[in-house]
Each structure stands twice: as C-alpha cells, then as structure tokens.
C-alpha cells in the first residue's frame, strides 16, 4: 500500500491586485504545481477586503505566505520569486529531500 502523502495548507496574504500581488501568486502557483501537485491547498486572502483576517493572523506586510499545515507554522514576507528560498523558508525543501532519500533507500 502506498504511504499517505502530506497535504500542505498555505495562505497567501496580498494587498489588492497590485503587480507585487499578481507576481507573488503566479510564482507561488508555479512552485506549488511543480513541486506539490495535488497535495496542497492554497487560500489567497486580500487584506484590503478582509482586514480582520490579517489582524487575527498578525499579518503586518504583504505579500506574506504562511504554511499552516503540517506544523510548525512558517512565514515568508516579501519576495517569493526564488523557488529554493521559498521552499527552505517554509521548511519544505528539507522534507522533500528527506522523502526522496527514503524513497531511494526503500524506506517508508
């Protein structure tokens, strides 16, 4: 039986439809579709339309990307254009490498 894959729950906080917001979403979608296709959920939150959500989650700047699940919560604030920095910042790159090493060794 194949092992269950983790589902990654992410929130992207943006401020309207600005060039920075559009670029952050496009870049993030590219990374997620390439690296985590089918095992992630992304919620985009416009802090101009939903300021209460930003306040509840203590978001002070945009764009902010938060990995909610699996724990621990991790955040990246600002530029999301560097794939490796995004994956490392969210603590996803090391999991990816660890999972690949386990696959190579036949571990579960």
Swiss-Prot record:
Effect of residue 8 to A: Enhances KaiB(fs)
A Pfam cross-reference name: KaiB
Temperature effects on activity: Stable from 4 to 40 degrees Celsius.
Result for mutant: residue 94 to A: Enhances KaiB(fs)
GO BP of this protein: circadian rhythm
Task of the protein: Key component of the KaiABC oscillator complex, which constitutes the main circadian regulator in cyanobacteria. Its composition changes during the circadian cycle to control KaiC phosphorylation. KaiA stimulates KaiC autophosphorylation, while KaiB sequesters KaiA, leading to KaiC autodephosphorylation. KaiA binding to KaiC yields KaiA(2-4):KaiC(6) complexes which stimulate KaiC autophosphorylation. Phospho-Ser-431 KaiC accumulation triggers binding of KaiB to form the KaiB(6):KaiC(6) complex, leading to changes in the output regulators CikA and SasA. A metamorphic protein which reversibly switches between an inactive tetrameric fold and a rare, thioredoxin-like monomeric fold (KaiB(fs)). KaiB(fs) binds phospho-KaiC, KaiA and CikA. KaiA and CikA compete for binding to KaiB(fs), and KaiB(fs) and SasA compete for binding to KaiC, thus the clock oscillator and output signal pathway are tightly coupled.
Domain notes: Has 2 forms, fold switches to a thioredoxin-like fold (KaiB(fs)) when bound to KaiC, KaiA or CikA. The KaiB(fs) form binds faster to KaiC than its alternate form, so less fully phosphorylated KaiC forms; the KaiB(fs) form activates signaling through CikA and inhibits signaling through SasA. The C-terminal region may confer species specificity; C-terminal hybrids do not all rescue deletions in S.elongatus PCC 7942.
PANTHER family: CIRCADIAN CLOCK PROTEIN KAIB2 (PTHR41709:SF2), KAIB-LIKE PROTEIN 1 (PTHR41709)
Family membership noted in the UniProt record: Belongs to the KaiB family.
Name this polypeptide is given: Circadian clock oscillator protein KaiB
Name of encoding gene: kaiB
